[in-house]
Amino acid sequence: VCVLNVNARDLNILFKDIIDPLLELKNINIGLGTGDNKYEKHDEIFDNDIEVVINYILKNKNFISNNSTLFIGGNSQSKLDLVQKYNLGINQWMGSDSDFIDKHNIYNNLINPRGTLSRCVTNKNIYVFDYEKIFVVKDSNLKIFQETIDNIFKND
């Protein structure tokens, strides 16, 4: 799994240096988000169109032939609309259990989605529906890396 903030760099650099090499990999699960300064501070935030990135990936021959998947992260209605428009997977990084159940309901109505329903977890909530659990091993913010690992593996 690789999650990318589409606004962290210039669009051409994003395609050439990040996305194109990732699309060479087989069975890569790519996540896209637009980022904000809520969890990680950025010196510069670009205003890239996430739909341009989605279309670039979905039309890429390697994405198709390598059996890769694509999901969107975020809780906004605009992100959920993109999931439905492009038939993508959904990930929840932060947010409430009720937000995740709402995402499950949206995902459940997709026909042959191009990604999975997933949640980055630090707790042991059990749901009766199937979803991919993503354990965060490294956060891009190195300052909180150790704290994140401690929170993932602590016994509540």
Place the predicted regions along the sequence by residue.
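Active-site-adjacent structural elements that line small-molecule/cofactor binding pockets in enzymes
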Residues: V1-D156
